Amino acid sequence: MAPAFFDTRGTSPRVRERSGDIPVPEKESKPTRLTKRWSRIPLGLSLIVLSLFALTGCKPPKVSPIIFRVMTYNIHHGEGLDGKVDLDRIAKVITNANADTVALQEVDQNTKRTGGIDMAAELAKRTNMHVAFGANLDFQGGKYGTAILSKHPIESYENHVLKQARDGEPRGVLQAVLDVGQGRLLFAGTHLDHTRDQGERLFSQTQFDELFAKYEDLPIIFCGDFNDTPGSELHKRMSENWFDSWELVGQGPGLTMTSDNPTRRIDYVWVSDKKNFKLRWTDVPKTDASDHLPVVAEMEFKPAP
């Protein structure tokens, strides 16, 4: 297996793209003792008892909410502020957070610059989690994209490469349906355009409704590096259909970029609603394992059957 450390100083940490002004788009048993007992009760009496249950409004016990912890983390292809690629360091950040599910951005798969390592698979081994990888770009003999790690089984997943308003680095949305024991949820991750012009990010956002429509019966968590700050047009449009976990329960500014001296909040954990999700807390752990800081959020949620 390739070594875990690589010195990538002197190479471009990200794929460069052409900038330009982009028009902003518009907007399934055996009988139990109880059932045997009920079988000896005359039918008429059974009907009376059942009617009483109906009249009194008795219902089956509700499923208790699940405590669920998520993380989003742009790992900068495993490269820390020291210019070295160290997957053990990244894995430690993930493990220390004890997250149930993690959305990762800037993930290399078999590229030359990181020694041909399948980063998503290696991080899954180091953290003992299930994994899904979404490739958005062919790069240096391999692939580059996003990934999802999960302690819970991944029932299905799909990666959508987004349409672009101009030539540049392709972006995508990776969606995974998770079986959390008592039910299911959809966990998704993305990494949007990083250039100053907001047009490409807004064009990406216009595609989200269609991508999530087939999962409208599931509670949804949508994480990632959105490369835009609170108060931006992107954040305003996202807030029309999603709830920003930091705005709900975060303390302080929640800055995530750059990790040694963060001045911007561009990494987010969004939830689809406040009926199925009750945020408990959110945090930005300090680490120099990447140029971004991770965001961790814990919540109570009601899974879909």
What are these regions (language model features)?
Residues 73-75, 107, 190-192, 225-226, ...:
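Active-site metal-binding loops of divalent metal-dependent hydrolases
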Residues 77-82, 109-110, 165, 196-200, ...:
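Short, flexible loop segments at the rims of nucleotide/cofactor-binding pockets, characterized by
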Residues 103-105, 132-135, 221-225, 244-246:
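Active-site neighborhood of phospho(di)ester-bond hydrolases with catalytic His/Asp-centered motifs
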Residues 59-60, 177, 199, 206, ...:
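Metal-dependent phosphoester-hydrolase catalytic domains
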Residues 82, 101, 107-184, 276, ...:
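Structured beta-strand-rich core segments of catalytic domains in phosphoester-bond hydrolases
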Residues 1-46:
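Intrinsic disorder/low-complexity segments
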